[in-house]
């Protein structure tokens, strides 16, 4: 798998998730390398001290020195917007470093692999760019304004066609990359909409086992058979996107299925979420003496720009608190006691 290289980024607050991604790749894609853009010095120092095989950490300062155009956007963008701006530039950085790699694939830090990605790469034969649709349920169709495709998996073959797409994407994110919808633009993600018509050899990944997530899980039947999570009976789960998973109210870990009006079955709780939560807790326990990361929180959203956005944010916060209480009442949460999830 040495010709397949992955890259991601996260800070020390996301460290347990990033390491869970790494360990799942080690199990299911042995020999592949994971490059990590460390968004804080604490993150870099921890990863450097762990010295894990096939994990290549890089300081944010090193990346910015190599791409001053991206670094120049930092004062004009929120932390989250700046991280989004870095996505294609980080891919391009890794493509230039990994000249022998066949594919360089960007992964969001909150992905977790349950099976080998070989089935995905079989789809990509002859392709130079790989993108994956959100596959929103009908209940979430209004979210298409955020993009047809999800930036959680974006792959580029290390050839002129792949590099052309990533280079264009980087330039567009330098030009504009904000955490709100502006026409057909949204963060780093909206630009993916034009990939199929703009570039050659673009493959839209069809395997429904790739990027199962709260926003699309309601479309499928999820079962557990023969030690595998199966989607619609015949397709094994390759990787899940644990977007929105977070701690709250001290001892609880919440998911955001209710935000997407998505089901949360016993099989999903036991065979999808529980293994991931257990991995996070094990990682936090093992690296606790190095860095305390037990209170993992998502990156802050963009700064408030008007009263409407402020009020909308207040409404979201109230809604989320109500959802948390409902989840506690209906068994959708994990209670964490002494490092064990129940």
Tell where the protein language model's regions lie, with residue ranges.
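N-terminal anchoring/stem segment of glycosyltransferases
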Residues: 1-75, 95-101, 288-342
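GT-A fold catalytic core of metal-dependent nucleotide-sugar glycosyltransferases
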Residues: 84-136, 155-156
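A structural signal for short, well-ordered beta-strand segments and their strand-loop junctions
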Residues: 35-36, 105-106, 131, 203-207, ...
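Short, charged, surface-exposed secondary-structure boundary motifs
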Residues: 64-72, 138-144, 215
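Low-complexity, glycine/alanine/valine/leucine- and proline-rich hydrophobic stretches
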Residues: 236-285
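Conserved catalytic core of nucleotide-sugar-dependent glycosyltransferases
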Residues: 121-175
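Catalytic core and acceptor-binding pocket of nucleotide-sugar-dependent glycosyltransferases
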Residues: 161-245, 252
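Short, solvent-exposed loop/turn segments at secondary-structure junctions
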Residues: 13, 41-43, 111-112, 135-138, ...
